[in-house]
């Protein structure tokens, strides 16, 4: 794999992840959620929420929000109370701090001086501020003040693919570039009490978690000091036909409000083969079970329908499902948790490559639009 052509490709060189300290077990969450939102009187709604949690295939999640925070700021726990100011303040501070924790882990694994980081890409769902989280992280990490910064807000669950697409373009077109990506996601802006008229809001309360991931991307790695993990071969973005309005988020005085169509899993799964064919036809690959898979776990129904539509073997989304089980849906950061888990499991299991022993793989991001990001990956030999 270490040909001159491959050396020119952008590669992921390090991965770091972080979560808030507060761990919530899914089996206990309905009781916690309805208690802290003063909603225990909504007995039928609580039963619906319990079923959502039971069917989520999530075991635990990490959240910044605590009972103490909700007691001090009761409007956050209400369904549509004015609360944006306090949410925003927590989000701005928390996103930067959690992102810093993940970034320091990635930089430590990379093992090179921070002065070699030439570009910074930061992505988070909310917390729009000036200067933004990119500026805050530059300061918190003590990066060179001339680092070239990019800031993405309000992209959502597909954005892990977006930032890789941008990092690939930067790394391959700027000699010596080393790009630090930080995706830091918190649900502080969208936590709210239940509503009998807005049931899709409860889906988010049942599956979303907080987490940050950081990766370092560069082309032409110095193999004496840098260790590639995955090569970024190609990238693509598309809007799913007839999907307008299927996934939306609106920032209101009461925080970020999500709206989802029940048809989201069908819309995504019906179009996944087209995305695969467009990405892999140039490589003469049409056996989707010959790939390793890193798919954003928007929820179990999406994973189930994609598996069925593509004819995937059960084990293909094993790592994706494990991350969903252990962390929930952490928006843009989730695919990097999956990528990190996959390379670790490949080493633990004695497999030949970072991609479960396979050479070629695909990373998918699904989110508002419906937008689909597709990244073709190539694994590298495992070095124990």
From Swiss-Prot:
BP GO annotations: flavonoid biosynthetic process; polyketide biosynthetic process
Top-level class of the enzyme under EC nomenclature: transferase
InterPro entries, per the entry: Chalcone/stilbene_synt_C, Chalcone/stilbene_synt_N, Polyketide_synthase_type-III, Thiolase-like
Mutagenesis / variant outcome for changing residue 249 to L: Reduced benzalacetone synthase activity
Gene3D superfamilies: 3.40.47.10
Source organism, top-level taxon: Eukaryota
Active-site residues, Swiss-Prot/TrEMBL: 157
Pathway note: Secondary metabolite biosynthesis; flavonoid biosynthesis
Keywords: Acyltransferase, Chromophore, Hydroxylation, Transferase
SUPFAM superfamilies referenced in this protein's UniProt entry, alphabetically: Thiolase-like (SSF53901)
GO MF, one example: protein homodimerization activity
Pfam families: Chal_sti_synt_C, Chal_sti_synt_N
Disulphide connectivity of cysteines: none
Listed EC numbers: 2.3.1.212
pH dependence (record): Optimum pH is 8.0-8.8.
Record field: catalytic activity: 4-coumaroyl-CoA + malonyl-CoA + H2O + H(+) = 4-hydroxybenzalacetone + 2 CO2 + 2 CoA
Modified residues (S-(4-hydroxycinnamyl)cysteine): 157
Annotated family: Belongs to the thiolase-like superfamily. Chalcone/stilbene synthases family.
Record's function text: Polyketide synthase producing 4-hydroxybenzalacetone. Can use p-coumaryl-CoA as substrate but does not accept hexanoyl-CoA, isobutyryl-CoA, isovaleryl-CoA, and acetyl-CoA as a substrates. Catalyzes the initial key reaction step in the biosynthesis of phenylbutanoids.
Subunit structure, interactors included: Homodimer.
Protein name: Polyketide synthase BAS
Classification lineage: Eukaryota, Viridiplantae, Streptophyta, Embryophyta, Tracheophyta
